[in-house]
Amino acid sequence: MLNKKKDFDEIYSDLMQRADGQCYSAYIGEDYLPHINMGQYRERSASVPKRLMYFLTLLIESLKNDINFPRFLMIDTPNKEGIDKDNLIKNIALLTEADKHNYENKCPFQIILTTGIDTYSEDYKKFVFFKLEGEKYLLQENILEEKC
């Protein structure tokens, strides 16, 4: 168990330092919650990489080891927390790290991300499945005709 925690801490710390230029320390505590910079207070936008990299690390661990975590991530509008566009794009680009840990594509996994238009790198445009623009809404009103 200690080896898995150590492995998690190494991956999480690496991802956090790459996601947030002000991060110098990242690990999970005995309570399994993420701790950044020895608990030093950070602005609200720092919670985006903290959570995103935490869940990405769990996904990576599930690809490497048999742990109780689905090989599936759904991330809904991480930009709501006030992170600036450039840092959001940098954080989203780190999602490709899952591929690097999925040796020989042995484990299928999926990441679904909903975010603002063009808040991802050019490399990710090929992965965009659906865009809501203009008057296009995900949910549509269904008008039924009355039959007499």
PLM features: residue spans?
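Extended, charged coiled-coil "arm/hinge" scaffolds of SMC/Rad50-like chromosome-maintenance ATPases
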Residues: 1-33, 61-70
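C-terminal lobe/lid and adjacent interdomain/linker elements of RecA-like ASCE P-loop ATPase modules
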Residues: 91-148
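Conserved catalytic network of the ASCE P-loop NTPase/AAA+ motor domain
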Residues: 42, 64-67, 100-106
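Domain-scale terminal segments
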Residues: 68-69, 73, 85-86, 101, ...
